[in-house]
Each structure stands twice: as C-alpha cells, then as structure tokens.
Amino acid sequence: MWLQVTNCSTLHSSLSYCGANTLSDMAKNLILWLVIAVVLMSVFQSFGPSDSAGRQVDYTTFVREIGQDQIREARFNEREITVFKRDNTRYVTYLPVFNDQKLLDDLINANVKVLGTPPEEPSLLASIFISWFPMLLLIGVWVFFMRQMQGGGGGKGAMSFGKSKARMMSEDQIKTTFADVAGCDEAKEDVKELVDYLRDPSRFQKLGGKIPTGILLVGPPGTGKTLLAKAIAGEAKVPFFTISGSDFVEMFVGVGASRVRDMFEQAKKAAPCIIFIDEIDAVGRQRGAGVGGGHDEREQTLNQMLVEMDGFEGNEGVIVIAATNRPDVLDPALLRPGRFDRQVVVGLPDVRGREQILKVHMRKVPLEGDVEPSLIARGTPGFSGADLANLVNEAALFAARGNKRVVSMQEFELAKDKIMMGAERKSMVMSEDQKESTAYHEAGHAIIGRLVPDHDPVYKVSIIPRGRALGVTMYLPEKDRISHSREFLESMLSSLYGGRLAEELIYGVDKVSTGASNDIERATDIARKMVTQWGFSEKMGPVLYADDEGEVFLGRSVTQTKHMSDDTARAIDMEIRALIDRNYERAREILAQNMDIMHAMKDALMKYETIDAAQIDDLMARKSEIRAPKGWGDTDDVMKSSPTTSESAPEAKTESAPEAKAEANVETEEKPVAADSEELKPKAEQAPKEDDKPQA
C-alpha cells in the first residue's frame, strides 16, 4: 500500500508540475499579448484625433454671440477655438480660414479676453519613439512568431521539423526490469553484459574490451523486443531515448538526416545512455539501385545513421538498440560489426517460456484454484508473449461478463477457443441443410486428421459460426514442432482435402460447394514448396526452383531473372499435381472405408454443435454411447448413436455464394499453432487450424 501511495503522490506531483508549467506558459503568453495590445492602442490613439472639452458649435453662432456681447473669453489653438460665455458655459468651434483679422478686431472691440496657445513640440524621446516604434514592433512580432514556430522553450513548433522526435526517459521513469520479461532467457543473457557495462564500464575497459555499440533485437511480432529494451534501460539506470523508425522521414528534404544528427547530439550530452529505435526497417531498409531517378530521402537518413553509429567521430557511451521483425531487408552496412555488433534473436517461447509468461501476466488476475499455467502453456503452442497476454485478458473479460470474482480454467478455455478459432456468432441463423453440410465437411477433416500418420491430434470440431467461419476443425500439436517431415506434410495435404471429399461422397460431385477454396489454396502452396524448395520430389531432386520474389526496392537486383525453362516449369506443375492426386486419393479411400464414423460424427455435431477430443475418441472407436461435452446439458449425458449407412444419407441441396466463402476462408490462416523457431516454414506448412467453411 505504501508503494501505491508513493506512486500516486509521484504521479500527482508530476501532473501538478506539468500543470504549473502549462499555466505559467499561458500566463506569459497572455501578458505578452496584453502589452502588445496596449502599446498598439496607445500609438493609434496618439495619431488619431483628440477629444475636445465641451460641446461643438458652428462658426456662425459664435460670430453672432460676439455681436450680442455673450462671449467672455476665447482661447485659440491653431484652428480650434474654445469659447467661454458670460453664463460660465463653454463650447468649441473651428475657424474656417487661418488668420481671420476681422474676427480678432471684433473680439477686441467686444472686450473679449483673447488667449493663444503655443504649438506643442514633441520631445526628443517621443520623436525617436514615434520614428522607430513601427520598425521595432515588426521586428518583435517576427521574433515572437519565429520562436513559437521553432518550438521555443522546448515546445513543438511548426519550424522544429529538423529536431529529433526522440523522447527521453530518465532512469526514474522506467520501472521495467528483467523480472517483468519472461520466456526469452537466452536473449536476456545476451543483453545482461550490456547492463553490467553501463553500471561498471571500468571492469571491461581495463581488459581492453569494448562493449557492443549496437544490439539488434530480431524476432516475430509480439515476442517482447520492445519490453526487453525497456528492461535493459530500467536495469542499467541510464537515460533512455526512444523513437520509431518512421519518425525520421517526413515531407521535407533533409529532415531525416537532421533528426538523426540532433538525436545523437542529445544522446552524447546525456552519455552514458541508450537509444532505442523501434521498427528500424522503416529507415534501415537496404539501399536500392536508384531506379526511377530523383532523390531518395530515406537513403540519406540511413547514410547519416551509418555515419553517426560508426563514422569519423566516435559515440563513446551511446549504445543503440534497435528492434525489427524484418532483418532480411536491412542494409548490410547497418549490420556490420561496429554498428550493430550483436543480433539477439527473441523467438517464440517454448512450453517453459509460455508458462513463465503466463505467470507474469497472471499476477494481477485473481485466479481459481483449478488454474494451472503449465496446462495452458502446453495447449498454446505457437503463441507469442502478446498472444498470451491477450489470452489472460480475454479470460478476465469472460469472468467479468459472468459476474465472477475469480477467473477459472473454464474462462481460459473459452478465451483460447476465441483466439484460436474466432468469436462465436450465436445470432447467425443457419438452415438445417447448411448445418448438415457443414457438419459433413468438418467431419471429413477430423476423420482424415485422426487416421493419417504423423498428424497433429484433432483438438475440437465445431459447426458454430466463429468470426467469418461457419465451421472449424482445430488441430493442436502435442509438442512444439521445430521442423516438418515429408510424412507430416503429405498428411496435411490429405486432411486439407477431407472436407471437400466428404461433401463429394455424400452429395455427389455436382453438389460440392466452394467452401474448400482455401483448403485447395493452402494445399497447393504446400505441394509447390515441397517440390520447388524442400526437395521432396524424386523427379526434380533436391534443387531450388523457387522464383526470385525480391523486389528492386529491397535492393540486390534491378530485374528479376527466370530460374527455370518452360519444360522445367511444366515438369514442376506435373509433380505438384501428382503429389496432390496421390494424397487426394488416399483421403478418398480413408473416408470411403469409414462412412459410418462420418455419419455418426455428423449426428454428434448436429446435436452438440461442438465436440472435443474425448468425444472424437468415442466416435473413432465406434462406441454405441458418446460422452457429452463438458458443461453440456440438463437432460442426457450420453447420446445413443444410431447406425447409419451411406444409403440413408440425405440429399441436401445447398447453394452458396463463392464470394462470401472466399472472404470467409481468408480467416482460416490467422493462427498457426505449431511454430516456435525462426527456421520454421511459413504459415501454410505449419500445423494450422482447419476452420474452412463449406457454406456461406
């Protein structure tokens, strides 16, 4: 509690300090504008006509009153006459002409006291002020606005585009430590000596060693690269400059290089310190071949960064940490020793790492006694740190939605299903024909997945619409897969076609829907890579036939070259077709031999809508009684499975919109679940979930 009060008071004092500074700046600006307004009003008033005392009377009345002996005194001030009457009233009139001698004679003859006022001569100071004030005023206004535009006093003005946007955080502002970072022990070990150097540089210097001037954190999104950089700064207790790679380049030429110079100048003044550049691939992308002409502002920014990091002048005490998930596109000059001496890979966590990450995020969540982080970690292969944080948060939201005080294992299961398979769309109404067709489709995926060798176990099958999917077959690996065998990949090809084949066997070739479009796309991609990249074709051999997919703006080449002849490309297409046909026929034979299981699984899906691994085990064992899923129902705990045959298969006639299905199938590849290494193959060759929708 004391720590919370201290933090709150610190926050309150910080807010009060910021508020006081803001009010002080506002008061200064207000006073300045008031002074300018008063001076301008004084000047305009001095040049404008002055107000005269008394009322104004026409000259004719004045002459007539002289003859009537009503005037006692007349005071002349150039053409203005102030008249005092004998009844002690006064008024003002003006001479129509100068030097009216007759008027003076009439006034003297009428015994009127005549007074003259000498002309007012301005003082020397007033003359100088009147002469120079307009120019001084213009200069002052120009200086004021230039200071405002340039962000005078540390502000962000319109002319401050050449200044660095890096935010400096002092050691007191960074509370993150290595205790808050879990699941990347090797990466923490790599950067701990950096912290030791910042704490005690002499220990390294007396042995002639130099600390790396730059560290590049490499890894997939969500693995904690930015968090690790903050932990380094929090442990080292040094100033920490943070900036994004996209903050350097803007609309003006030369801004990026100017900001790089300004950032390193600020860092040198605060040395020893850390500069953290997030998403450095935005500015550090490999320099191109100059196609298209013109001036590449990003390249000039990169050149300036190369010079600042290791150029003619050293940056003693300034350590640059950068993070990226695209190290392949960075310029080689940026990655050489002397700039980024060390590359630290922050990969996806393994089972133990996921358990540690879950424990970190569960600190702030009240948990039921049945929650086991180790079980959750084993059931979430391929999850990054950000995914696990989202999992804990979703579980807490499920518990709050149910007005619970603690989060149980049930909420974590619901959260995992939502993340891996999508949110349930309970409001969507499907016809019985659509549900039945979807059930057969998903049953085909599940049966093939259970019967082919070296395939990930089937975790759950559902015909509840989730996200943009109408049906889901989820595979969950038993362990983290570092690489994939040929047997596993061919089993994936067979299981991907299981849904289409189930529809074909039940409804006939003419009634097959477009729901398998994404299955076909993914299977074709896997087969093509097996032939052209991974050497799994005896005819083509272990040769790389992949096309050059690098663009010129990523550097290295101006034109793309063709790596194969037309005959070779034709042979590759034939090998891909043969590979797919072989596994397609294998899947057909498996389903044809297990039609009774497919009908039983369809009936279970129609009743329960979602079945798990335990029910699938009962179905595959052809048991007469099938266990109900967890949390199911009030009435029957078991369902009597009625034996059905292919003759009794319904003749469901369903039409579907290809556009809707194609859009829905995009969602099937969002969560690969069998990947924990940088050497892993792309999404298509990982063990993915099968949320392919036969109907839309």
Swiss-Prot record:
Transmembrane segment boundaries: 30-50, 125-145
GO molecular function: ATP binding; ATP hydrolysis activity; ATP-dependent peptidase activity; metalloendopeptidase activity; zinc ion binding
Any Pfam family: Peptidase_M41
Cofactor binding annotation: Binds 1 zinc ion per subunit.
Gene3D superfamilies: 1.10.8.60, 3.30.720.210, P-loop containing nucleotide triphosphate hydrolases (3.40.50.300), Peptidase M41 (1.20.58.760)
Cell compartments where the protein resides: Cell inner membrane
BP GO terms, sorted: protein catabolic process; proteolysis
Active site: E442
The protein's Enzyme Commission number: 3.4.24.-
PANTHER family on file: ATP-DEPENDENT ZINC METALLOPROTEASE YME1L1, METALLOPROTEASE M41 FTSH
Annotated function: Acts as a processive, ATP-dependent zinc metallopeptidase for both cytoplasmic and membrane proteins. Plays a role in the quality control of integral membrane proteins.
Subunit note: Homohexamer.
Family as reported in the entry's similarity comment: In the central section; belongs to the AAA ATPase family. In the C-terminal section; belongs to the peptidase M41 family.
HAMAP family the record matches: FtsH
Protein name (record): ATP-dependent zinc metalloprotease FtsH
